[in-house]
Each structure stands twice: as structure tokens, then as C-alpha cells.
């Protein structure tokens, strides 16, 4: 008989890349249909549209905590109580794209733009390494200033200085040739949120020149090259429905990524979606739990956006099945830009 995970009571960071998560388990008298559905999803590692609707409609505190606790059990069975720590370096907020939801879209004349130098980025890595970080995530908009040569030079410099570290890139859609160059320079992982797997929904979020088919192809190219790949989506974005979320989950199941990054849509005042309601923490936590039930081995970050909408958002994400946090190593003066 499978043993229950041991109860725990605190969140604490060790001296290297792991954090222990701890919460006392709860007792619940959840209705049989929800319990049965969670067990079926967990066992089949798949979910039907009807099952997704049922789980997303859970709106009582007891029910939400129950699905979160089940997800934590699944996560513990694979990873124990460890949470992986990645150091995030946001090195540019220039972007050629004009996504309707994004604060760094090219049309946003109010954005306070910046670029970090190679030296600044290496300083960020040095600070992170001293703190015990062994993965650095280089994230930025699709900024033409950072040519393939510059990216390759940066990746090579980090790998040369810190050969025991992994380098993750999150710099958008590139050609397969560019992705291969970064990989050959030493990049290990690549994060590219697909944002939505539904064609009509994608068109509501992006201008005409952007294509869901191309974005998906980028993810397949990255996998073929040999990267550990991450995809993901926003929760509560304008036009999102249970049906589009179901498409997201089916695409993730098809892609089988190494990481899935989800977080609430947050309305940004200088975008066309300024007047749209933001996504909720409750729905995000439920979806984190659902993804964990379907994908026991996936790396699942508790994102910055969760921490933005709730002071303990990232901790609650961990206690919903997430197992990665990415503290920001960027210089303090650019973190809010």
C-alpha cells in the first residue's frame, strides 16, 4: 500500500538550489464525483473536457484545497519535498512584437526600456552562483539588438565561467538555425510559452503578423535540436474558455515538454487589454494542480505573476503542485521596468 506523504509545517531554503515545502495535510469529505474524477485523471494522466469543466468549477475552499493536496502528493512522489531554484535574469525589455496583453509590446511608448550589458549579466550570474544557483534563465523580449552572435557569446561566456551550471533561454521565436547556434554555444533549455493552443483565441491575443502555427513549430524545432523545452499559457486571458484550456492541455500532452509555465493574465494599463479583468489566483492554482496530476514529472514553476497578484502567491503555487521558483537576479533598478 502506498504510504502517505509526511506532514510538514514550513517553507525553508537550503544553502543550494533546493527549497523544502511544507504544509499540514487536511481532512476532507469531498463529494465522490470530484474524488473519482481526480483519481481517474491521476491514473490515466489525461483529462476529458467534461472532467476539466468539473474540476475548474470547484469553488469552495475545501474542494480547492483537496485538489491542491492531491497534486502535492503526486509531486512529492516524484520529487520529494524539494523545489528547484532558477535564477532569472531579465536582460532586455525591447521587443519587436505587439502582443495585445504585454507591457513591453513595441507600441507601448510609456515603457521604460533598458538593455543589460554582457558584464552586467555576468555580474548577475556571479551573485547567483554565490547564493547557490546552478541554473540561469536569460529572459527578454524579441530584441534585434541581441544578434545571434551576441547571444552565443553570452551563453559561451556563462558556460565557460560556470561549467557546472545550466543556461536557459527565453527570448521568443527564432529560426531553427538560430536555435541550433545557441544550443551549440551551450544553451541547455529553452522556454517559449505557446500562450494558447486555440487558433481563434491566439488571434484575439496577437496581431496578424504572428502565427500560432509558427510558434508551435518553434517548440517542435527546439525539441528536435535537443533542448529541454518549456511551454505554457496565461490563465484568464481575454477570450479564454474551458474549451481553449482543454486545447492547451492536449497540446502540452502532445508536446511532452520538460517544463510548463502558467500564470494569471495580469491586465497592463498601457495595452489594448487595459480594461480587461485579470486572471484569478484560484483558477491558476487549480490549473497548476491539474497539470501536476496529468504530468507527475514535469517542472512546474510558481511564477512571478502569482506573486504579483497575492503576497504568498508563489508559496501557494508550490502547495498546488508547482516545484520550481525563479527569483529575480536582475539589477534592482530594472526589475519594475
Q: Predicted segments — roles?
A:
Residues 79-120:
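Canonical Radical SAM [4Fe-4S] cluster-binding loop centered on the CxxxCxxC motif
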Amino acid at each position: 500500500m502506498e504510504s502517505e506523504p509526511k506532514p510538514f509545517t514550513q517553507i525553508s531554503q537550503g544553502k543550494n538550489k533546493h527549497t523544502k515545502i511544507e504544509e499540514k495535510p487536511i481532512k476532507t469529505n469531498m463529494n465522490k464525483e470530484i474524488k473519482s474524477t481526480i483519481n481517474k485523471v491521476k491514473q490515466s494522466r489525461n483529462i476529458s473536457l467534461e472532467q476539466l469543466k468539473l474540476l475548474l468549477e470547484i469553488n469552495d475552499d475545501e474542494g480547492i484545497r483537496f485538489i491542491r493536496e492531491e497534486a502535492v502528493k503526486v509531486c512529492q512522489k516524484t520529487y520529494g519535498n524539494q523545489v528547484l531554484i532558477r535564477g532569472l535574469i531579465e536582460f532586455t525589455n525591447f521587443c519587436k512584437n505587439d502582443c495585445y496583453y504585454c507591457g513591453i509590446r513595441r507600441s507601448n511608448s510609456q515603457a521604460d526600456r533598458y538593455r543589460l550589458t554582457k558584464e552586467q549579466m555576468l555580474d548577475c550570474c556571479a551573485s547567483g552562483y554565490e547564493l547557490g544557483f546552478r541554473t540561469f534563465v536569460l529572459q527578454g523580449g524579441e530584441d534585434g539588438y541581441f544578434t545571434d552572435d551576441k547571444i552565443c557569446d553570452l551563453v559561451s561566456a556563462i558556460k565557460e565561467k560556470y561549467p557546472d551550471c545550466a543556461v536557459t533561454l527565453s527570448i521568443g521565436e527564432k529560426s531553427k538555425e538560430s536555435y541550433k547556434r545557441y544550443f551549440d554555444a551551450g544553451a541547455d533549455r529553452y522556454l517559449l510559452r505557446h500562450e494558447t493552443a486555440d487558433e481563434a483565441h491566439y488571434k484575439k491575443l496577437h496581431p496578424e503578423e504572428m502565427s500560432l502555427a509558427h510558434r508551435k513549430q518553434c517548440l517542435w524545432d527546439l525539441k528536435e535540436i535537443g533542448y529541454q523545452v518549456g511551454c505554457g499559457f496565461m490563465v484568464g486571458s481575454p477570450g479564454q474558455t474551458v474549451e481553449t484550456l482543454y486545447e492547451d492541455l492536449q497540446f502540452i500532452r502532445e508536446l511532452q515538454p520538460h517544463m510548463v509555465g502558467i500564470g494569471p493574465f495580469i491586465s497592463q494599463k498601457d495595452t489594448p487589454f487595459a480594461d480587461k479583468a485579470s486572471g484569478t489566483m484560484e483558477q491558476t492554482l487549480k490549473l497548476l494542480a491539474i497539470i501536476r496530476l496529468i504530468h507527475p514529472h514535469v517542472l512546474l514553476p510558481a511564477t512571478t505573476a502569482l506573486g504579483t497578484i497575492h503576497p504568498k502567491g508563489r508559496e501557494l503555487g508550490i502547495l498546488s503542485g508547482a516545484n520550481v521558483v525563479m527569483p529575480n537576479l536582475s539589477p534592482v533598478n530594472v526589475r519594475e521596468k
